[in-house]
Amino acid sequence: MSSTDEKKFEGVVSEEPVLTASSSSDNGRAELGVSTNGEQPTVDPVFEKATLRKVDYWLVGFYSIVYIFRVIDSANYSNAAIINLEAGTGIKAELNLNASQWAWTLSIFSYSYLIFEPSNTLLLKIFRPSRWMFVLIFFWGAAACSSAAAQNFSGMMGARFAIGAAEAGFYPAVLYHMAFWYKPQELPNRIALFYSVGQLSSALSGLLAYAVSFMDGLQGISGWRWLFIIEGLPAIVLAFIALFWLPDYPETAYFLNDKERAFLASRLDKRAPASWGKSWDLEALKKLFSDPTFYTFSVYWIGHGIGGFGIGYALPTVIYQLGFTSTTNSQLMNIPPYVATFLFLNTLGYLLQRNIIRPWTTAVGIAVTIIICYIILFTVSNSVVKYIFLIVAVSCAGSAYPVIWPERMRALEGSVSSGVGIGFTNAMAQFSGIAGPRIYSTVFGPSYHVSYGICLIFLVVDIIALLLSWFFVHRKDKRVAALLEQ
């Protein structure tokens, strides 16, 4: 290979991971669970599986528990719209909110996400994951509890903005943190599990709202205020668990022995984020912003966020306006869509991990399915049929991002590019929180024909951006393969 080719090759192809602290020593390899049969080292699968299982418990397991309460916190604000509505003690009545003001209290949350989300991944690298996660989790728990004290529109706007600012960094920071521990091909089922637990907690939020509705008036406190207090307290407890027990990086993980730490630290691609990597690199950012996938993935995240995911911000109200349930039972009817999402997403994660299906074709299929659901919702009038296809649409919408995230992360290189790229990409999804409450405003109910029509347009944009991203990533893969052959 020429020196010119070598320079091109560096930045698009990773070197073989160094599997041992002493690569020249077969004994050293054996100690790290690596054998040398011929030229290519092979990893002991039993040792690797056991080591990764430990990481799964401490990293994926903990983050999944935290994500349950993070999603409950977000989802329950939509549930609060109809809690104790008939009793006259609902949140809109007590805070004197009109339709426009209610939409603003929903969307201000996403504005703070857009502002604070892109930088949070880098802050995690600067301050260490355990410390930064403590800050995020503690402050969103405290802000959630504080929102129960809101007395008017401006008070709730301030509380919601503070919650969004604290929660903004959590999801992209989790993905970024995982990239320090796992190979890209190991991420699909782990991201699917983590994300689907959050979707299941959206179902639990409906159950929690249903139960809390019976606390209305207890100690002179309205049901919706109890809801915000109860959902915020667990986050404060989990924040201290993160501070003292969340592992930062493979090299410093207290629950691993020396052999396991060395193995995990040496197995990743050189382009993957690393604990010793820079926290800021202007050249890496220039390369990131010149990559066409930075823009095509961003458009996809916006298109799917508004077209597919936006309905989630108004789902309790949409279900209530189907006309065959009371507000109390409507909380329970929010559960099936998210249970379906949990089952569907974990099934997809299982199939993706075993290469039975491919992420790109699966993501396109999801978008097409949502389009079909919206067309049916647009044309039929039967409430039961509408509810069934709402379940299908919500389960598909909630599964799209986790399916394509590993491909998005694979297209990023290095600690800085990965951090900024993950944060910025996920921030684009917050347009759903800005546009969703307005697209699904009650002024378009109960049919929501205008809402479904607008979302159809965004889903078409979603598919185009997805196909372009697929093209650019595939082109890069071909370039890598060609250089490998030289």
Q: Positions of the model-derived regions?
A:
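Intracellular terminal tails of multi-pass secondary transporters
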Residues: 1-79, 83, 99, 243-278, ...
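Glycine-rich segments within core transmembrane alpha-helices of 12-TM secondary carriers
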Residues: 188-221, 228-235, 422-436
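Helix-to-loop junctions at the C-terminal end of transmembrane segments
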Residues: 115-128, 343-358
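Extracytoplasmic gate region of multi-pass secondary transporters
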Residues: 78, 283-349, 401, 405, ...
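Extracellular/periplasmic helix-loop-helix junction of adjacent transmembrane segments
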Residues: 78-114
